[in-house]
């Protein structure tokens, strides 16, 4: 019973922890202000799509995407569409490649970068942001990728362990 509740509880905790880590941003380094955007929940959803169940990761993606839209950005539908789409794409990709932790980590970081780019382009398109692409790349995208990669290196194996444990329990 405990393992059954573990997957949604971890997702809820990650959803609640992200804004706490966002408080550490912006940071001034190398005469530049950098922004670190935690994407812990998004990475967890991608791990669910790869190691557990694509359908459940899509459902979690829609639910938490809507919650993210409502509580953090006030534009309904952006994350509610991007989270499940990313889960679908990564689950399709891993059918053709090895599902080792290193490969999934690289793919997850790639999807974090892609998510950040799509969100930036959307906000730029609706004039919600005015920073240029170069500033975005240097002050937000690259630091966000490194920060989330560090998080995955530290906790990715724990994600995989919990998800695999739940999968074995359901068999």
Model-based region annotation:
Residues 1-171:
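Terminal, non-globular segments
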């Amino acid at each position: 019973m405990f393992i059954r509740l573990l997957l949604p509880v971890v997702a809820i905790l990650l959803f609640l922890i992200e804004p706490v880590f966002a408080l550490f941003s912006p940071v001034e380094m190398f005469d530049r202000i950098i922004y670190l955007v935690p994407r812990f929940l998004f990475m967890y959803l991608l791990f669910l799509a790869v190691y557990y169940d694509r359908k459940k990761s899509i459902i979690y993606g829609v639910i938490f995407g809507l919650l993210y839209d409502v509580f953090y950005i006030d534009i309904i539908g952006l994350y509610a569409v991007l989270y499940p789409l990313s889960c679908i794409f990564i689950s399709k990709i891993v059918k053709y490649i090895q599902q080792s932790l290193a490969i999934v980590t690289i793919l997850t970081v790639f999807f974090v970068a892609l998510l950040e780019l799509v969100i930036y382009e959307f906000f730029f398109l609706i004039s919600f942001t005015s920073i240029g692409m170069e500033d975005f790349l240097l002050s937000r995208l690259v630091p966000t990728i490194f920060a989330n990669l560090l998080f995955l290196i530290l906790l990715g194996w724990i994600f995989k362990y919990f998800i695999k444990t739940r999968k074995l329990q359901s068999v």
